[in-house]
Amino acid sequence: MSKEEKKNILIYSFSGLLLISLIAFAGIKNNGREIEDVKVEILDQEGIFFTDQLEVVDLMTDKSADYVVGVEMGDIDPKTLEERVETNPFVKDAQVYRDLKGNLQVKVEQSKPIARLFIDGKKDRYIDEDGRVLPINAKHTARVPLMETEFEFIWERNLNESKFGKQVFELLTFIEKDEFWKAQIAHVIIKKDGEIELYPQVTKQVVEFGKPEDLERKFSKLMTFYKEILPKKGWNTYDRVNLKFENQIICE
């Protein structure tokens, strides 16, 4: 190895050690800095207002029992603060970190409901985009399809706890992800035999959907009913449309 190569290795090694030392020093200095402010951002609200900045700060500080502003950054445990915020059932995820300006940054992702559930006309719950069963929120009412069941509700935490619950969740997700069906389907009823009835927002027909399976095929038939049959026969001609039978659309 030449003298020039040895010299370059020494220079690079010294530069690396210097950089590591500077980063470590900056970290120590930053840990001793006091929190100046708390910045809360509710991500991707999309018209959902289940929580707000004030409530997030209350949860994070245990209703001001544990002060954050004025506390040294090194004394803050972001993980503990995240866990406190996530005790709100409508908070899907919380990220807490310290920035270089002395602020505590809090990013909150809310749960997104896809249906509001009524059980025997009494119990009232939301179902979110992950299938979780959530309580009703006094702050906000989500504009989502209503779903009723005629049997005892068996899913305590998540629809995906059972095979049938997973099928129901897939049906709700299918409706949620399609802009037309999301606007058209207002009411979903699960009957005692496990079959589904859909009630549209605009037209008067009850849709006998059958079991929550073969979603693509059944919704394709329903679209044919709306696009080809109703315009020819009249929008108020039929009271019911049955999608349960393969290759048939039965109108009554």
Give the predicted meaning of each segment:
Residues M1-D44, F49, Q53-E72, I76-T87, ...:
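Charged, solvent-exposed interaction patches on well-folded alpha/beta domains
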